[in-house]
């Protein structure tokens, strides 16, 4: 298992920034990024920007706060991987295994599997869909103690 890389999905980044019940757990994970390099497939950039734009659109954030959130996301220093055909095939296989119509989550799974590293999510639906698979490299953010401010 690769210990210097960790895959995080967009839900972790967004829930670390926007107020929600998992924020302190996500912030605890973000604190570990001094020890490990966070990484994600290229769609992470689109998903985080879209979530922040949606928060501004629905008045959860002001436009200025949205711009600050984009800066916070950028400051995470994510290593972005552009999927190749092997990643596409692996994502397709994960999508079929999960019995889903879209492959977004599957690209995170495929990347973690390919790079042989841990994958952290704050997406309960995704985590629950794979809980019975007992994937040692799949982690739910509440496994970490919340960050106390």
What are these model-derived regions, one by one?
Residues 78-122:
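Active-site neighborhoods of divalent-metal-dependent phosphate/nucleic-acid chemistry enzymes
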Residues 33-36, 76, 115:
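Structured helix-beta-strand junction loops
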Residues 1-43, 55, 60-67, 147-148:
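Short, well-structured N-terminal submotif of metal-dependent ribonuclease cores
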Residues 1-5, 97, 109-149:
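Acidic, PIN/NYN-like endoribonuclease modules and their adjacent C-terminal/linker elements
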Residues 25, 47, 90, 128-129:
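Phosphate- and divalent-cation-binding pockets in alpha/beta enzyme and binding domains
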Residues 30, 49, 53, 92-95, ...:
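Amphipathic alpha-helical segments within well-ordered protein domains
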Residues 12-13, 44, 87, 107-108, ...:
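Alpha-helix capping/helix-boundary segments
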Residues 43, 49-79, 88-91:
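Active-site-proximal, substrate-binding regions of enzyme catalytic domains
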